[in-house]
């Protein structure tokens, strides 16, 4: 990647004149230089491939380990069909977000607004296109979702490392990994995740195929049963976890803004989802085939596979990847916080890192309160992802282009596979109604019922969620028995 191309391209100027302004917080303007730089190669990303790696890596994090649990709640057929269904819906709404970003950016650039040293975020797109009420709605849902998305990564870290070293309980591991993940405050923006995104996707690819192959080699457990959906509450809990799986694009706008040519993002999320299918469907299917209903009480797939070097390797790689995903989820929160306290245009990485630290503290605390790995995914999916990722983008697109003049002057016309504005409206309306009723309604009821059951069973601040009880020590003989 040549440094002179590291400036973002202005969207307005016929989509072809390069704007050499960075538009990225905390970075100096690049000097035109044709020499190869290792720093640029590893640190400064903004290509289509960088965006693809970021989307795929962020989408397929710890959910790999909970999807077999969801299959045990849904049954094999429903599990596969819902993955495909929500994968398509998620790709469509990511496309809508990219269209709205381009529309917002093009309107602002026509007004000569300069985005140098400012990262555009989703709530700002909503504000610019639909007004302050939509800004508040987007800010509330997006920030809350990203907050709990970060919480889930911390919980997953503690859950996974426990299967390598159970000398410490999961709560203690949460303390340790909270401190480790706090180091993400030093990563300025999504430009700087190039090498991490690449490594992260490699790690999850290894883990997915480890789960698949290890389950097949293990074979079916003795007396395994596959009863499938037995209760509505379990069915909708599992369905909502899959909705959550393919709703990882709360950071879409930030990833787009980190691209040199953001208008090329349109189909990147779909391409990422197609790759993710090759990881999630085989692994979840194989683990469920091997262990069946036993997964209902084991939300982490690692817990049922035999301990060996291959499993330990997968655990370690997932831990590193969860650190990366924590950074993905937290970085937009860092940006929001910087804007609130007036530090967003600060050049010093150290000053910005110091300013960002307060964001990590509530995440750490919530991970200790709600350590329910698995059930918390479904709750977040139903209550937050349903709005953040599916309902709000679909409704926002419908309202942005409700007038004929807006459709006529749209920066992005309807896609080639759906060239009619009417068809787009119908599909968007279907998504809003479906996700509102099935995802938020039934999914919210089921996931919260299950979540409350976990609280009743294990309590808040559970020291070691779903850990095996310690072996009962044999009772010592009574003192008089020792004197025969």
Curated annotation (Swiss-Prot):
InterPro entries from the UniProt entry: AA_transpt_TM (IPR013057)
A GO BP entry: amino acid transport
Entry's localization field: Cell membrane
Ranges per topology, Cytoplasmic: 1-59, 101-135, 194-196, 254-266, 336-356, 400-425
Protein name: Auxin transporter-like protein 2
Transmembrane residue ranges: 60-77, 80-100, 136-156, 173-193, 197-217, 233-253, 267-287, 315-335, 357-377, 379-399, 426-446
Residues carrying a glycan: 223, 297
Extracellular domain ranges by topology: 78-79, 157-172, 218-232, 288-314, 378, 447-484
Entry GO terms, CC: plasma membrane
Induction: Transient induction in roots by S.meliloti.
Tissue: Shoots and roots of nodulating plants. Higher levels in roots, flowers and stems, lower in nodules, leaves, petioles and shoot apices.
Name of the encoding gene: LAX2
Main localization (coarse): membrane
Role, per record: Carrier protein involved in proton-driven auxin influx. Mediates the formation of auxin gradient from developing leaves (site of auxin biosynthesis) to tips by contributing to the loading of auxin in vascular tissues and facilitating acropetal (base to tip) auxin transport within inner tissues of the root apex, and basipetal (tip to base) auxin transport within outer tissues of the root apex. May be involved in lateral roots and nodules formation.
Molecular function terms, GO-annotated: symporter activity
Sorted UniProt keywords: Amino-acid transport, Auxin signaling pathway, Cell membrane, Glycoprotein, Membrane, Symport, Transmembrane, Transmembrane helix, Transport
Family (UniProt): Belongs to the amino acid/polyamine transporter 2 family. Amino acid/auxin permease (AAAP) (TC 2.A.18.1) subfamily.
Source species of the chain: Medicago truncatula
One Pfam assignment: Aa_trans
Superkingdom: Eukaryota
